[in-house]
Amino acid sequence: MAVSVKICGLTEAAGLAAAVDAGARYVGFVFFPKSPRHVTPGTAAELAAQVPLGVAKVGLFVNPDDAALDAVLAHVPLDVIQLHGAETPARVAEVKARTGLPVMKAVGVADPQDLDALWDYGLVADMLLIDAKPPKDAVLPGGNGLAFDWRLLAGRQILKPWLLAGGLTPENVHEAIRLTRAPGVDVSSGVESAPGVKDPDRIRSFIARATAPIL
């Protein structure tokens, strides 16, 4: 089965075009003001209009209230809501019911016990994004370029479709997929030339290596 690729934190047309043309299955827009990848609903709407059918538009939110979700959805035709904060399983279910959209929940992992949350969130979310847990003093909940021990996922059965994230780059994504057998991968900082600035060449390289056969 082909690996699905999500390019997250897109802010301009060149990066978006590179992702779409190279075969990304998901493109992500960040609605978190503290992130260097933050976009306004207006900018996201302009970019979303350039996304062809068959590529899912994902909106990343961090602990959003209903008003924050409504403000974006009034302008941007998202296909998936990504929750990347400390949202509880109950809140995940609320967001799913309120928006009528599939919800992808990020789960931060640093050690084996963190994997227990995959069960709780797997009962309510449509998809899971397994990311490196950010440091306690981190401003951003993701996109920090940090990886976790991928061997923690080896042979593990996960309830829902999932993406591997955290510290992935064109240089290591193939090995990460080999170790985890991840059905999908997510990248943001690993395909940038500077924080928030996507590098089209690195996007193309990442997707090519992520989708190369595992021997």
UniProtKB/Swiss-Prot annotation:
<dbReference type="InterPro" id="IPR013785">
    <property type="entry name" value="Aldolase_TIM"/>
</dbReference>
<comment type="similarity">
    <text>Belongs to the TrpF family.</text>
</comment>
<dbReference type="InterPro" id="IPR044643">
    <property type="entry name" value="TrpF_fam"/>
</dbReference>
<protein>
    <recommendedName>
        <fullName>N-(5'-phosphoribosyl)anthranilate isomerase</fullName>
        <ecNumber>5.3.1.24</ecNumber>
    </recommendedName>
</protein>
<keyword id="KW-0413">Isomerase</keyword>
<dbReference type="InterPro" id="IPR011060">
    <property type="entry name" value="RibuloseP-bd_barrel"/>
</dbReference>
<dbReference type="Pfam" id="PF00697">
    <property type="entry name" value="PRAI"/>
</dbReference>
<dbReference type="InterPro" id="IPR001240">
    <property type="entry name" value="PRAI_dom"/>
</dbReference>
<keyword id="KW-0822">Tryptophan biosynthesis</keyword>
<keyword id="KW-0057">Aromatic amino acid biosynthesis</keyword>
<comment type="pathway">
    <text>Amino-acid biosynthesis; L-tryptophan biosynthesis; L-tryptophan from chorismate: step 3/5.</text>
</comment>
<dbReference type="GO" id="GO:0004640">
    <property type="term" value="F:phosphoribosylanthranilate isomerase activity"/>
</dbReference>
<keyword id="KW-0028">Amino-acid biosynthesis</keyword>
<dbReference type="GO" id="GO:0000162">
    <property type="term" value="P:L-tryptophan biosynthetic process"/>
</dbReference>
